[in-house]
Each structure stands twice: as C-alpha cells, then as structure tokens.
C-alpha cells in the first residue's frame, strides 16, 4: 500500500493479482489508481489516440487506461504520459524482469515508465524518463531524464519537453512477437525504451537472434544500456512512413556497464566505439539509387561507425559498418565497410574495404581494389576508381536485393554502354558465358565491351543466366593485350591488337591448317601440318568445379588465346586480330551470308532457301532451335568497324545409347581468314560448351570429298562413324513427310 506522501520501495507481492481492488465495472488490467500497489499486474492497451491533459488519460467510455495524478505506484504499469499514435503497447505476463523506475523490486521492472516520484537509494533504474523538474538533479547515474536541468541527454533533432506531448509513439508501434512470448517487438518508428531482459527487435535495431525480422528505416547512432537495448533518440514530430529523414543524428551519451548488442551498440569504455554518422538524404525508396551523400565520420582508434540508413516503410534497410572485426554476424542487408569480417553471411552487402575471407555474398557492391579470395555470386567489381558500376540500362548502383538473373534478355539495355576494364586479379567477373535453363550451352545474347580496336562495333549485347548459378550476370569484355604478355584470372577473351606480333603460346605453333570446316576444306590445295600434335588446336582443359558452369568456363580458360596474330604462308591474311562471341539477333544477315558462302563453295547455293526471318525466329526466340558463335575481325570497310568472318551453328541432340550430344551443324571461316587459328579457337569453345552442358560428345558431318578435313579431325581423335560403325545418314524432305503423314 502506498500512502499519500509516502514512498515505499520494497513492498512487493510476487505473482499476486488482486482484481478485487479495482472498482466495479472497470477492467483490472487497464486501471491505474493511486491506491494499493498491485504487483505483476499486466496493463496492456495503453492506446491514447488523442491529445490529453498532462496527467489524465481517458481514451474511451470504459475508463480504461486512467492515469490518476498522485504518488508513484511501485508495482503498477502506468501508461505513457503522451499522445500515442494508433498502435498498442502490449505487455505480457510472461515478461520477467520488468522495470519499475520508482521502486526497486526484485524481478519487477517496467519499461517506459514515467514516474513523478524520486528514486530511492536501493533502486536500479534503467532508462526511465522523468519529467518532473522537482527531481531533475536526483537521477541516478543510469537514468536518463528529459528535464530542463538534464545536461547529458543525447537527443537528435528535437526533444519534446511538454509532459502532455512527451514520448509520442509513432504509428505501428508495439505488438507481440508470437514466436517469442513476452518479447516486445515494434513495427517501424518506435521510440520507447524496452524491458531489460527482453530482446527488443524494434525499429531502430537489428537483432541477429531474429534474422527473420526485417526492421527498417532506423538509425542506431548511440549506445544502449546494459539491460535495455534501446536507442534514446527523439525526433520532432512523427516520421512519415516510407521517407528518409534529412536530419543530422547525433550520438547519445551512453552509460557504463552496457552490453553491446549485435546491431552495433558498444560501451564507450570498451575498445571499440561506434559513432553516429551524418546521413542526409531525401526520400528514396528501395530499388532506386540512394540520393544524397553519406559521410562517414573520422575513424578514431578502434572505432566503428554505424550508419543505418532508412529505406522506406515496408522495405529492408541497409546498415554500414566500418572497421573492426565482427565474427559470426548474420545481418542481412548490411552495408559493411571494413576489413576482415569473417563468417559473415550477408545478403545485399556493400563492401568498401580489403579482402573479406569466408564471405558468401549475393549482389554486393565492392568499390575496393581487389577482392581476391572472395566467392561472390553476381558481383560487380569495378576498378580502383570505379565507384558506380554501369548497370544494365544506366550507370547506377545495383539495387539491394536485386538478382541479376531477373535482368535477363527481356530487360532494357543501355546502348553504347562502356565498361571500364581495369585488370582485376582472381576475380571471375568478365568473359563468362551464361546460359538460360531453356537455352543450354552458350546463349547468343551477351554484353560485349570492346576496346579501342572495336570502338565502332555494336555495343549492345544481352545476358542470360547460367542454370547452375541463376543469380549471376557477368560481362564478357574484350581487353587489349600487350604482345608477349598474359593476364591471369581476368578471363577476358580473344581481344587481339593488330600489332603484327604473336603472343607466346606454350607449345602452340599456329599453321595455315588449323581450322578445317566440317563442310568446307579450309586447307584445300595444301598438305596438312603433320608435325602438329592433336592438342595443338583443341587444347581442351579440364577446369575446376567453378569453371564447369556454362556461365563461366566456356570462356574462362582461353586467356592464352587472347592474341592470335600469325603469319600465313598462304598469303591470305598476314596477321589479324579476331574476336569470337555468341551470336545475337543483329547477326542474322551475316550468318545467312556465311551460310550462302559455304553452300556456294560446296556447289549447293541454289538449295539455300533460308531467310533472315527464319534465322531470327528459329534461333533467337524463347525456345531456340540452334545456337551460333560468330568470329569478328576489325575492318575498315564496314561502318561498324568489324566484319563477321566466321560462324559455327550447333544444337543439342540425344543418342539413346550414350545420352546428350552437341551436334555441330555448320562450321565455316571466310577464306581470307583461314589458317590463323580462328577455327581452332572456335573448336575449343565448342568443346567447352559441350563439356559444360554435360554432353557426352560432339558430332558433325564432313563432306565426303573434303579429305583434308577428314584427316584433320581424325588426327584430333574424332571417330569417323561412317567407317567405324557403318552409318548412313538419311533424310525425308517435306514432300516425303507429307506423303508419310497421309498414309493410313
């Protein structure tokens, strides 16, 4: 019992509920009187939808939530002396350790209590807000008081001093977490303190114990109390949902004995101190470029800077942490800017530091130098000066949470898009072929960034995700090479500078008889180079597991073939740089031209009835019937600056005895460009595609009188099934099919 004028701090009756003490007709759970203390009484629904007088709250006709001005009730939960926006502050009976700021009672404390009475000597108040100026100088060391004499309150922007307007709750406040009884969980925009023994996943903190809770749009710029994981920030007025505040958040002084939470709370007496950072930005929803600058404060010794940016209502927030090693953090959607953060499983991670081993990151930004050792999917790694990576249709940041596989060939592209091509060791970011699950092998549509040799070529290519790694979208970039040099780990293919020299190819001596076509004898009239081993031209290497994906290895092991500048004794082409890439729809006219050129050589040009429309429909739709590789070389005779000099058409078939096969239907290199290694590189790429798509072999047809090609492929190890197995190839033409279809 609390008598008027008497402050009793030790009278508790644990686990005793006295509903009879309430007047008739009033709910004992929503009643507060200056009479008998009722310990452990749960008084939820402290919802006050309108402005009330400083000491009285009468929210409805049932007279629940009545605040009677008077002496402090030690064991009764009092509602907030302020206007609470719609939302409910629910307190569960199972919440142990409730805080009571006016009386120290073992096992009982209430969070968010506003008590007019002074604290006693034996009380341990944690984060009570006292508004009575009479006791402005008596608060204990661990007590925050918003009074006129308070000098240590760390409040950003505006502190509301009026008791009638104090501690306004923002919309969508407290609600019960069903998976954690007794835990108070807030929706966004919550400003109350929390119980000491309750992990509060509120709007301004990320709790790693509850990774499924996506809290958003809040800052954590100050340090929490040891028992209350609470950020004592106040902001003038309610915050509009879904908008970022352009305010400067200041660090709130923290108390001794705090337990740093995983969301970035640290005691100032410890070695690592987190500082709030100014973030000024306008409204910027997720999936758009973040507007406004973000400024990291000065890095002091062992300091961690915490910027938790706001990204709008209903969207995930990002958090930026700088320096300091943090182990076993599993915070999603964090911007992490530090060195050595092992064991982190971060999604949508911004990283601006040195190597971070052991990180598995989806869709990250990295603007550091080199990230060797990282295993990162769909990661864009620009050079040292490239802060913003050119993304699909513009130069803008990658949106957090966006998967590159969602921006496939149907996404808008940016014409004439240039991609910086600095050397980046051990990053498989370029030259990776990627395949759509419905389009096995290497899809024809890619992004190709040329160098100066290809400055006037078509800039637009398209992407297709790899079926093994659907979240990856990579660039296939042509990079200039210096003579006699090699680039390791950058996987930048077959971009050759016409400097008249030949790069060092270990054991490779390109002759004029390297790329015979299955249908056309490229070396007719000359003897095959019998001194060349079978591996001189194919060189199919077994890549590692990460390179066996169709999106990667079909191009990743061709660095030694970057520069094919050879001397041809036949006098057709003394030297030439060439580039092999997947075909795109714009290549249909050139492909048809090469098909007719091959048919003309074989004496069957009149049999070609195919049109460009047929090629486009059958090879570049949703379910392509064939795939193509094209070879290009610089040319001054074309407006684009390059000329298509060869192609390979293939598709997939099935052998009921051994399984999936890659069938090479047509393979042709223009006569002027034969003998400089283009056909050999084309075969190598086709072989890698067959391996990556889990084919059991590659088969093709060679015209019977092309003895040079027969000998060439036999030397490489191909079996002549016409001789080995005695096969004859038959075909029914359309007329025959019509007759067969009509037969009964």
Swiss-Prot record:
- Residues annotated to bind substrate: 601-602, 665, 699-701, 725
The lineage's top-level taxon is: Eukaryota
In the record, what terms sit under GO molecular function?
Answer: acyltransferase activity, transferring groups other than amino-acyl groups
**InterPro entries xrefs:** Acyl_CoA_acyltransferase, Diverse_Substrate_AcTransf, GNAT_dom
Entries under CDD domains matching the protein: NAT_SF
- Please note every region of biased composition (Polar residues): 1-20, 29-50, 59-86, 142-158, 212-230, 248-259, 485-509, 553-569
Q: Where is the composition biased (Low complexity)?
A: 260-271
Positions that bind acetyl-CoA: 667-669, 675-680
The family database entries (PROSITE patterns) matched by this protein are listed as: GNAT
Basic and acidic residues bias locations: 510-523
Q: Which Gene3D superfamilies match?
A: 3.40.630.30
- A Pfam family annotated for this chain is Acetyltransf_1
Q: Which UniProt keywords apply?
A: Acyltransferase, Transferase
Q: Which residues form the N-acetyltransferase domain?
A: 578-735
Q: What EC designation does it have?
A: 2.3.1.-
Location of the region described as Disordered in the Swiss-Prot/TrEMBL record:
1-271, 399-425, 485-576
Family to which the UniProt record says this protein belongs: Belongs to the acetyltransferase family.
> What is the designated name of this protein?
Spermidine/spermine N(1)-acetyltransferase-like protein 1
Species: Mus musculus (Mouse)
Q: What is the lineage of its organism?
A: Eukaryota, Metazoa, Chordata, Craniata, Vertebrata
Give me the gene this protein comes from: Satl1
């Amino acid at each position: 019992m609390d008598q008027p004028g008497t402050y009793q701090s030790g009278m508790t009756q644990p686990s005793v509920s006295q509903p009879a003490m309430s007047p008739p007709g009033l709910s004992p759970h929503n009643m507060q009187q200056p009479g008998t203390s009722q310990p452990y009484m749960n008084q939820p629904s402290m919802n006050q939808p309108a402005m009330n007088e400083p000491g009285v709250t009468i929210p409805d006709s049932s007279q629940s939530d009545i605040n009677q001005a008077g002496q402090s009730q030690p064991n009764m939960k009092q509602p907030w002396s302020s206007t609470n926006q719609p939302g409910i502050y629910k307190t569960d009976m199972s919440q142990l350790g409730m805080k009571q700021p006016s009386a120290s009672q073992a096992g009982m404390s209430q969070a968010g209590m506003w008590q007019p009475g002074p604290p006693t000597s034996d009380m341990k108040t944690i984060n009570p807000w006292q508004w009575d100026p009479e006791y402005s100088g008596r608060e204990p060391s661990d007590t925050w008081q918003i009074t006129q004499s308070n000098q240590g309150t760390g409040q950003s922007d505006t502190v509301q001093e009026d008791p009638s307007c104090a501690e306004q709750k923002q919309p969508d406040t407290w609600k019960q977490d069903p998976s954690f009884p007794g835990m108070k969980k807030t929706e966004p925009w919550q400003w109350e303190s929390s119980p000491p023994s309750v992990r509060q996943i509120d709007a301004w903190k990320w709790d790693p114990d509850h990774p499924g809770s996506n809290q958003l749009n809040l800052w954590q710029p100050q340090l929490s109390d040891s028992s209350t994981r609470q950020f004592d920030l106040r902001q003038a007025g309610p915050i509009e949902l879904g908008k970022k505040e352009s305010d400067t958040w200041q660090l709130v002084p923290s108390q001794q004995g705090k337990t740093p939470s995983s969301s970035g709370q640290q005691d100032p007496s410890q070695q690592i101190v987190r500082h709030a950072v100014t973030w000024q930005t306008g409204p910027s929803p997720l999936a758009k470029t973040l507007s406004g600058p973000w400024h990291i404060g000065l890095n002091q010794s062992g300091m961690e800077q915490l910027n938790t940016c706001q990204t709008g209502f209903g969207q995930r927030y990002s958090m930026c942490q700088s320096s300091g090693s943090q182990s076993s953090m599993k915070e999603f959607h964090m911007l992490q800017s530090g060195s050595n953060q092992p064991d982190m499983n971060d999604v949508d991670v911004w990283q601006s530091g040195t190597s971070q081993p052991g990180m598995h990151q989806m869709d990250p930004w990295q603007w550091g130098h080199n990230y060797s050792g990282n295993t990162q999917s769909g990661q864009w790694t620009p050079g040292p000066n490239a802060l913003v990576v050119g993304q699909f249709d513009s130069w803008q940041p990658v949106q957090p949470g966006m998967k590159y596989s969602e921006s496939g060939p149907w996404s808008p592209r940016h014409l004439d898009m240039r991609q910086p091509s600095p050397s980046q060791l051990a990053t498989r970011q370029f030259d990776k072929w990627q395949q759509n699950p419905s389009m096995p092998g290497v899809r024809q549509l890619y992004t190709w960034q040329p160098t100066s040799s290809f400055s006037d070529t078509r800039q637009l290519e398209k992407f297709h995700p790899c079926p093994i790694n659907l979240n990856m979208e990579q660039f296939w970039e042509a990079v200039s090479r210096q003579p006699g040099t090699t680039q390791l780990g950058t996987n930048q293919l077959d971009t050759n500078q016409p400097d008249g020299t030949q790069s060092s190819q270990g054991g490779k001596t390109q002759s004029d008889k390297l790329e015979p076509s299955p249908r056309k004898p490229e070396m007719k009239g000359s003897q095959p180079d019998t001194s060349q081993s079978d591996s001189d031209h194919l060189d199919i290497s077994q890549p590692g597991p990460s390179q066996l994906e169709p999106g990667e290895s079909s191009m990743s092991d061709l660095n030694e073939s970057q520069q094919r500048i050879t001397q041809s004794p036949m006098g057709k082409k003394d030297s030439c740089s060439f580039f092999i890439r997947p075909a795109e729809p714009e290549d249909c006219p050139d492909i048809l031209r090469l098909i007719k050129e091959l048919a003309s050589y074989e004496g069957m040009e009149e049999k070609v009835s195919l049109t460009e429309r047929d090629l486009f429909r059958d090879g570049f739709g949703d379910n392509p019937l064939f795939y193509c590789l094209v070879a290009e070389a610089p040319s001054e005779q074309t407006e684009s600056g390059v000329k298509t000099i060869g192609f390979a058409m293939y598709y997939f078939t099935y052998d009921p005895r051994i399984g999936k096969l890659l069938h090479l239907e047509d393979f042709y290199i223009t006569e002027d460009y034969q003998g400089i290694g283009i056909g050999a590189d084309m075969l190598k790429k086709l072989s890698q595609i067959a391996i990556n798509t889990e084919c059991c072999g590659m088969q093709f047809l060679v015209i019977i009188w092309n003895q040079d090609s027969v000998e060439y492929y036999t030397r490489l190890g191909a079996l002549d099934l016409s001789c080995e197995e005695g096969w004859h190839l038959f075909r029914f033409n359309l007329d025959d099919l019509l007759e067969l279809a009509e037969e009964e």
